[in-house]
Amino acid sequence: MSLNFLEFEKPIAELEAKIEALRDVSRHGGDSAVDLDKEIEQLEKKSLELKKKTFSNLGAWETAQLARHPLRPYTLDYIKHAFDEFDELAGDRAFADDKAIVGGIARLEGRPVMIIGHQKGRETKEKVKRNFGMPKPEGYRKALRLMEMAERFNMPIITFIDTAGAYPGVGAEERGQSEAIATNLKVMSGLKVPVICNVVGEGGSGGALAIGVGDYVNMLQYSTYSVISPEGCASILWRDSDKAPQAADAMGLTAPRLKELELIDEIIEEPLGGAHRDHAQMAANMKANLLRQLEDLEQLDHETLLERRYQRLMNYGYC
């Protein structure tokens, strides 16, 4: 699988290319294979050290690029690796089925849970089908329907957030985009079941927040969460989208900064180089975190759960 190296990963990409070339020669190299094996081993050590150095010192803009990586695991990838018996549920029962939101019932180590998440798509046709992960009102109303179903059947809700934002098209606005988002915020704040939200890529504005109100809000190590994209911010402040790196630094959109501000609860570690390098390992890290948090929340009665969530919301922005 091609890893689609980003601009700041060029030195790593060059080393990986050398290693792959030597491996190819080694496979057909006869007597020189032993010497090549030693050289490959040295280059692999050098590559590992370079990765550790690079990813231990990422800026906000580099993190934003990783959050958008085209091979990053999406909701359906987490479902595949971390859950069992997934049964997808479709439609908002009012207008249409928005493929930018996927959801349904699954089992997490035997527990029935409701899963809801954004889905961007990988190939061109799927990206168009999923509207590039930007939901319309019917997507958020589908999510609302599933959340209310989960409450009726006393199932915990797990959400996966990865969107540039809610779709801003004319049709979406005509069908009540802002109302759909606002209704979700209201309903999620009062659900009588545990809700765990996970930002796994881009957390873009109200489009992310519409499935992001919960008892725990987690972010992956290289995900982002912000009111606007760095490019959008730069276009407004400086009339120049090329200043997106400066905007990213100023916005405080990274997981460590948001945890420092107490806007999120936990940061989930990614494999070295980012979640796209090992979907199975990333899903395992996610699963372990979900199980621990669910065990904590399942000890609480409804009143305590709601009071704790209310206090969490009221503390946002409090200094």
Swiss-Prot record:
GO molecular function ontology, one term from the record: acetyl-CoA carboxylase activity
PROSITE patterns: COA_CT_CTER (PS50989)
Highest taxon in the source lineage: Bacteria
Predominant location: cytoplasm
Keyword Lipid metabolism recorded: yes
Annotated S-S bridges: none
Record keywords: ATP-binding, Cytoplasm, Fatty acid biosynthesis, Fatty acid metabolism, Lipid biosynthesis, Lipid metabolism, Nucleotide-binding, Transferase
Compartment(s) of residence: Cytoplasm
GO terms under biological process: fatty acid biosynthetic process; malonyl-CoA biosynthetic process
EC number(s) stated in the UniProt entry for this protein: 2.1.3.15
Residue ranges of domain CoA carboxyltransferase C-terminal in the record: 35-296
Keyword Electron transport: no
InterPro entries: Acetyl_CoA_COase_a_su (IPR001095), ClpP/crotonase-like_dom_sf (IPR029045), COA_CT_C (IPR011763)
GO cellular component: acetyl-CoA carboxylase complex
This protein's pathway: Lipid metabolism; malonyl-CoA biosynthesis; malonyl-CoA from acetyl-CoA: step 1/1
Any Pfam family: ACCA
Catalysis: reaction(s): N(6)-carboxybiotinyl-L-lysyl-[protein] + acetyl-CoA = N(6)-biotinyl-L-lysyl-[protein] + malonyl-CoA
Subunit structure: Acetyl-CoA carboxylase is a heterohexamer composed of biotin carboxyl carrier protein (AccB), biotin carboxylase (AccC) and two subunits each of ACCase subunit alpha (AccA) and ACCase subunit beta (AccD).
Biological role stated in the UniProt entry: Component of the acetyl coenzyme A carboxylase (ACC) complex. First, biotin carboxylase catalyzes the carboxylation of biotin on its carrier protein (BCCP) and then the CO(2) group is transferred by the carboxyltransferase to acetyl-CoA to form malonyl-CoA.
Family listed: Belongs to the AccA family.
NCBIfam families: accA (TIGR00513), AccA_sub (NF041504), PRK05724.1 (NF004344)
Protein name: Acetyl-coenzyme A carboxylase carboxyl transferase subunit alpha
Origin species: Vibrio campbellii (strain ATCC BAA-1116)
